[in-house]
Amino acid sequence: MTDMIEKTRQTDVATRRALLAQTLADLPDAATMEQFLIDLCTPAELRALSERWHVAKLLDEGKLSYREINARTGVSTTTIGRVARFLNEEPHGGYRTALKQLKD
């Protein structure tokens, strides 16, 4: 029974995440997106998201070491390493897609 409950929860999480992604994609502009994110996230969550995105851009530039990024941003080397792993190794490709879109 607990396996069925856990499977249902995982499905619900995946469905809710997909609905959130679609909602974000459907917002008309950056200002509306920012308003939605401010309502949706705590200040700490928003700070973490914006820090990760900043780190992704710095890593993509390839000019700074993890320690230099840490010194410049205050973001932990653990977080920097996690962003680097998702940027370079994980199959999702979200960071890469967003960075490419910035360059286009």
PLM features: residue spans?
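Long, charge-dense
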Residues: T73-S76, Q101-K103
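Short, amphipathic alpha-helical "recognition" segments used to contact nucleic acids or chromatin
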Residues: L49-K63
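A general alpha-helix detector
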Residues: R16-L20, F36, H54
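DNA major-groove recognition helix of helix-turn-helix
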Residues: A84-L87, P91
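Short, Lys/Arg-enriched anionic-surface-contact patches
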Residues: M33-R52
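Short alpha-helical "recognition helix" segments of helix-turn-helix
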Residues: R67-T73, I80
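Short Lys/Arg-enriched helix C-cap and helix-to-coil transition segments
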Residues: P91-D104
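General nucleic-acid-binding
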Residues: M1-L27
